[in-house]
């Protein structure tokens, strides 16, 4: 996702049909190069979302995992909107800080 894409999304602008077609073509090419089926990509998406959801609250409907190709390199890109951190993670950080403080005193 380019800076222009981010700004357009924030401004509520819809991408031009040519941009959508280009994105679809890049996705098809990336799938062909990696030999990943759409079913496998969806399974990976679900697993990635479930792992990330252990640590932060995410928007499952808006979460997207895609393949992007740039300069002959294909990347798996996860765009996961985070709603908030989970209280368990905060406790882990606090516990870690307490452990470090106790070690410093010893």
From Swiss-Prot:
Belongs to the MinE family. Keywords: Cell cycle, Cell division. This is Cell division topological specificity factor. It comes from Prochlorococcus marinus (strain SARG / CCMP1375 / SS120). GO terms for biological process: cell division; regulation of division septum assembly. The keyword Cell cycle applies. It comes from the Bacteria. NCBIfam families: minE (TIGR01215), PRK00296.1 (NF001422). Disulfide bonds: none annotated.
């Amino acid at each position: 996702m380019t800076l222009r894409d981010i700004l357009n999304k924030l401004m509520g602008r819809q991408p031009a049909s040519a941009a959508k077609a280009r994105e679809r073509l890049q996705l098809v090419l990336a799938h062909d190069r990696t030999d990943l089926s759409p079913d496998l990509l969806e399974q990976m998406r679900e697993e990635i979302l479930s792992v990330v959801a252990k640590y932060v609250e995410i928007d499952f409907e808006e979460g997207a995992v895609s393949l992007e190709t740039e300069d002959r390199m294909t990347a798996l890109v996860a765009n996961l909107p985070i709603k908030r951190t989970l209280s368990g993670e905060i406790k882990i950080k606090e516990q870690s800080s307490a452990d470090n403080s106790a070690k410093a005193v010893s």
